[in-house]
UniProtKB/Swiss-Prot annotation:
Transmembrane segments: none annotated. GO terms for biological process: translation. The keyword GTP-binding does not apply. It comes from Jannaschia sp. (strain CCS1). Keywords: Ribonucleoprotein, Ribosomal protein. This is Large ribosomal subunit protein bL33. One of its GO terms (cellular component) is cytosolic large ribosomal subunit.
Amino acid sequence: MAKPTTIKIRLNSSAGTGHFYVTKKNARTMTEKMVVRKYDPVARKHVEYKEGKIK
């Protein structure tokens, strides 16, 4: 079988709360690490989420 183009990634909160989102991205077109501004319910504000590996 062929290698899948989309991979699952974990977006870790930069606020240090331990909250994370799991999403997917196209590994061929987005080669750099993903950084997204999303809502952190623990910190109760919008913060940057940085890409990390799923363990």
